[in-house]
Amino acid sequence: MSFKREGDDQSQLNILKKRRVSDLLSNFIPDDEATLMKNGRYSCLVCSHRPVFDTVDMLVVHRKGKRHLEGMKWFYGKKNQLRREIDKRRHQDYVKAEDDRQEPSSSAPLLTQTRKITHHALLRTVPYSSCHKKASERSESSSKEHRNDLANSHLSMRTESNDSRTTVHQGPSEVKGEAKKKKKGASTLSSSVCEPLTEQRRRELDHYLKLKSSGWLQDRSGKWVKDENVEFDSDEEEPTLLPPCSESS
């Protein structure tokens, strides 16, 4: 039989709720399988039609019935499915967070590009790239060859100048000996152009240095062209040629 409360005293209602909760705990009924309603009755949360009982004893008898046991299978099957779905979502979120940590951030492409440039700069050899364009390779190689030709021509002129200075101080026999030793070395100008030979070399060196200081550059074919970074006073398209040496009497 059910307990009926008389009056509206809040203390009596609290005492009644406390006693009914104690009854639930004493019968080992989980909180997610039954609940205490506001009117003091018990409701079964396992069954889909939510039956209501006046006392705990009636709820215990209902829980032993066949219909309730079938409902428990469906109830816990649904609960386990929900738990597996939650675990699956958590695992997916965890994997996604780990992938985002490992991959570089797309919000900072400049930082990523800077790291790649720094990495390639520290390498001893240039890494192979199948996407590298052949035209760029040709332009880079031609520019390197142009710079190497300019450096070699300047070095050869300096070598010729040093040879001309040492030749002035040496005697005729020493000059012949040095000429035989350096016969396979740097190319020399023909002695039939003008006399003496050392004076012609010095004039060519002075002319070369004068053109370089004026802003002229020598390309691979030996032609003089204007430097784009230098301002010229006149509109001359070609530099002044080296005047021929006057014949000695």
From Swiss-Prot:
Positions of Matrin-type zinc fingers: 42-74
Compartments, as annotated in UniProt: Nucleus, Nucleoplasm; Nucleus speckle
Region Disordered: start-end pairs: 94-116, 128-199, 228-249
Biased segments, Polar residues type: 104-115, 150-170
A GO term for molecular function: zinc ion binding
InterPro entries in alphabetical order: SCNM1, SCNM1_acidic, Znf-SCNM1
Highest taxon, organism lineage: Eukaryota
Cellular component terms (Gene Ontology): nuclear speck; nucleus; spliceosomal complex
Motif Bipartite nuclear localization signal: chain residues: 4-20
GO biological process, one term: alternative mRNA splicing, via spliceosome
Ranges of compositional bias, category Acidic residues: 230-239
Basic and acidic residues composition bias: residue spans: 94-103, 134-149
Keywords on record: Metal-binding, mRNA processing, mRNA splicing, Nucleus, Spliceosome, Zinc, Zinc-finger
Subunit structure and binding partners: Component of the minor spliceosome, which splices U12-type introns.
Function: As a component of the minor spliceosome, involved in the splicing of U12-type introns in pre-mRNAs.
Listed name of the protein: Sodium channel modifier 1
Species this chain originates from: Danio rerio
